[in-house]
Amino acid sequence: MAPGPSATQGILLLLPLLPLSQVTLGSADRNCDPSDQCPPQARWSSLWHVGLILLAILLMLLCGVTASCVRFCCLRKQTHTQSHTPAAWQPCDGTVIPVDSDSPAHSTVTSYSSVQYPLGMRLPLYFGEPDPDSMVPPTYSLYASELPPSYDEVVKMIKAREEVAAPSEKTNSLPEALEPETTGGPQEPGPSAQRP
């Protein structure tokens, strides 16, 4: 049976441990007296802590390689499952802050004070507790094949959305302003109701 790729990788990882076996073999020779000249292998036998440090480094490298392989496999499976579901278009929220050239403090105050929201518009609360039921995953992923829109495209999309929202608010408020005010009590609508 031929060794597989994992067996070959295991053998390659064990190659740095080969000098450790020579150190233990050299320490088995007890004929060397400390006063005599000892062969180089026997000198290494007194440095057992070096082998322990090398073994610890090897184990950390092995753990790192294993963790990165597991992470790579999990991310690949995750992007593979996401590619089967069609991505629905989701609107982008963006903030455009105008910058004046007068001074940084003035431009900051001006940009924040010049933003006026309609009364019916719900402001995003950035510092509140997120509701797990309404949380939506981010629109763009780092592993997606397409890039997010550029800054200019986001600004155009926001302006287009504001322009669409602005006329609809104006048309809703116009009929209320054109209705005549009644001076008497409440009138019941019906065929006999007269309009001045």
Curated annotation (Swiss-Prot):
It is a single-pass membrane protein. Keywords: Membrane, Signal, Transmembrane, Transmembrane helix. The chain crosses the membrane at residues 47-67. Its main location: membrane. GO terms for cellular component: membrane. Residues 1-28 form the signal peptide. It comes from Mus musculus (Mouse). Coiled coil: none annotated. It holds the Pfam family TMEM52. PANTHER family: TRANSMEMBRANE PROTEIN 52. This is Transmembrane protein 52. The lineage of its organism: Eukaryota, Metazoa, Chordata, Craniata, Vertebrata. Residues 162-196 are annotated as: Disordered. It is found in: Membrane. The gene is Tmem52.
